Amino acid sequence: MKNSDTLTLTAEILRDLIRCPSVTPEEGGALTYLQKRSEAMGFKAERMIFSDENTPDVDNLYTRLGTDGPHLMFAGHTDVVPVGKESDWALGP
């Protein structure tokens, strides 16, 4: 893949993620998108919901590609804070 193709794909993924509804705790929009993208690349994806008595349920996505090493683990957040008043935005997502 050429550098220009990589940049185009990266911009496409970032654009799509920005458009996903993902305000805490409703981050399922971004997780659904990431699950579909990773499964299309051959990853096995699994969703797990963590819950606690006093907090909203939190959806998590785990993906795996193969079983042989070497292994790499990446952990990140897909949730964001509320956008505030959209009327204050010059451009929406």
Model-found features: residue ranges?
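Acidic/His- and Gly-rich active-site-bordering loop/insert found
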Residues: 2-93
